[in-house]
């Protein structure tokens, strides 16, 4: 039986209860078989184009970098059906689940975008859908919660996203007819590889589009990092392009020194979490610390193993942006470009703007993966601005 590589350097693996191993092995083989099946590939690409709306646009910003010599492009995953890049992976996972003969899916979600994607993909391919969401995020992501309720069977709440992912894994192990949609490029093998392969369309399109527009590759591609699915989707096709910098942006929250952040890559320690070996936010006793970010989708205490490996070998750089910086970028792109970006994407955007302003005379070509739209965040942003007297 063919096997995928379970590790990225020292990171990754399959640290799960024995009861889950057969399901993961079955999934791995089903994914390999699907990838080798031209009919599966054709159906997946057809759904991406005719249902999801790919290819997404590559938009040159007109005003954000005025006064500098930076050309900043946005890869518009916010224009994808469902409102974010999550649609790419759930369509693929849904087709695999259907191929495996599953009748239902279970998924966890933070900001709700993976939940929305899971619900729409399940409705499309005819699978029952149960979504588990942290109680805190149910409150701050009410628009996405209602969208999920329109399409999904049930949305029970947990206390935190950390608990939600563990509940989803536990429920998955209880029945052979259920397929688990994992929401990011993390977790036990083979999920990091599966999610990357269904998301790599982002980077593949970006490469073709930027070559057509500029006649060369960008100097850097940037993406926000929670678990890392949108970033690895952007990075995957550029990893072998040595002259293209890969820059991931973690949430610094209220400041790295406050411990209220979600930056395990640069400020965590290697541990075992969510079925994988990866950098992890831990206290002095080795217990998992709660992550924090104004952005629900980046509020995750660990990170995908391929990002950990890219960081370890120096192929990618990982920086951090605070809540305040992300909020400023959120407002800036709205006022200057007429785009309401997700708070997640605003972290990457904030770092790109910072790069342009640090050296305004430097000629550089940057691409930010605008991973989702900000409709879901408008109530959060309104509350924050109101508290600061900025409205």
From Swiss-Prot:
GO MF terms held by the record: tryptophan synthase activity
Coiled coil segments of this chain: none
Catalyzed chemical reaction(s): (1S,2R)-1-C-(indol-3-yl)glycerol 3-phosphate + L-serine = D-glyceraldehyde 3-phosphate + L-tryptophan + H2O
Pfam families per UniProt: PALP
Sequence positions bearing N6-(pyridoxal phosphate)lysine: 86
Pathway: Amino-acid biosynthesis; L-tryptophan biosynthesis; L-tryptophan from chorismate: step 5/5
Transmembrane segment boundaries: none
EC number(s) recorded for this UniProt protein: 4.2.1.20
GO terms for cellular component: cytoplasm
Top-level enzyme category: lyase
Cofactor(s) needed for function: pyridoxal 5'-phosphate
Keyword set, alphabetical order: Amino-acid biosynthesis, Aromatic amino acid biosynthesis, Lyase, Pyridoxal phosphate, Tryptophan biosynthesis
Quaternary structure annotation from Swiss-Prot or TrEMBL: Tetramer of two alpha and two beta chains.
Family: Belongs to the TrpB family.
Function: The beta subunit is responsible for the synthesis of L-tryptophan from indole and L-serine.
Name used for this protein in its record: Tryptophan synthase beta chain
Lineage: Bacteria, Pseudomonadati, Pseudomonadota, Gammaproteobacteria, Vibrionales
Gene for this chain: trpB
